[in-house]
Curated annotation (Swiss-Prot):
Protein's UniProt name: Transgelin-3
Compositional bias of kind Polar residues: 178-188
Residue positions, PTM Phosphoserine: 163
Domain named Calponin-homology (CH): residues: 24-136
UniProt keyword annotations, A-Z: Phosphoprotein
Signal peptide coordinates: none
InterPro entries xref list: Calponin-like, Calponin_repeat, CH_dom, CH_dom_sf, SM22_calponin
Entries under SUPFAM superfamilies matching the protein: Calponin-homology domain, CH-domain (SSF47576)
Cross-referenced PANTHER family: CALPONIN, TRANSGELIN-3
GO BP annotation list: negative regulation of transcription by RNA polymerase II
Residue numbers spanned by region Disordered: 178-199
Coiled-coil annotated spans: none
Family: Belongs to the calponin family.
Length: 199
């Protein structure tokens, strides 16, 4: 947030609400996974939101992460530059976001570049990394490194096939939603709005 002044009023309240969503425990888990997944000499950042942002801000760690989820030779980002120029770093973040979407992360789970670059919504960055980890665990293609229990496995399609005979048998069953013609009935019930006759 070096380029932005302090926010006041409603903007401040909104920013505080966004900052409350940030999870320090999740940060530790994500840092451990990224370092393990990349399997390179990536230094562990000091704990804290500002350090986490600074660690990811140039885009190199994110690009190495998405490349490590592909087999060798099929990496989506062939050239990762460790440039100090702002627009180059933002371009690398954008490349990561596009590659994550192609990998299978839903558009609704992807953060905006300014969320990371300006530190506006680091919780959104965490959500994107969690979604990326979930997709990697679900794919189970051998490229994921780390504990499978760190991320939720996404639901998979499970089609069922029924024969014509099974479908015909299902038509003979009276479902419980259809009601029953036995047992309790509405006999003796009064209509709505009528007073109850007690004698």
């Amino acid at each position: 947030m070096a380029n932005r002044g302090p926010s006041y009023g409603l903007s401040r309240e909104v920013q505080e609400k966004i900052e409350q969503k940030y999870d320090a425990d999740l940060e530790n888990k994500l840092v451990d996974w990224i370092i393990l997944q990349c399997a390179e000499d990536i230094e562990h950042p000091p704990p804290g939101r500002a350090h986490f942002q600074k660690w990811l801000m140039d885009g190199t760690v994110l690009c190495k992460l998405i490349n490590s989820l592909y087999p060798p030779g099929q990496e989506p980002i062939p050239k990762i530059s460790e440039s100090k120029m702002a627009f180059k770093q933002m371009e690398q973040i954008s490349q990561f976001l596009k590659a994550a979407e192609v990998y299978g992360v839903r558009t609704t789970d992807i953060f905006q570049t300014v969320d990371l670059w300006e530190g506006k919504d680091m919780a959104a960055v965490q959500r994107t990394l969690m979604a990326l980890g979930s997709v990697a665990v679900t794919k189970d293609d051998g490229c994921y490194r780390g504990e499978p229990s760190w991320f939720h496995r996404k639901a998979q399609q499970n089609r069922r096939g029924f024969s014509e005979e099974q479908l015909r048998q299902g038509q003979n069953v009276i479902g419980l939603q259809m009601g029953s013609n036995k047992g309790a009935s509405q006999a003796g019930m009064t209509g709505y709005g009528m007073p109850r006759q007690i004698m």
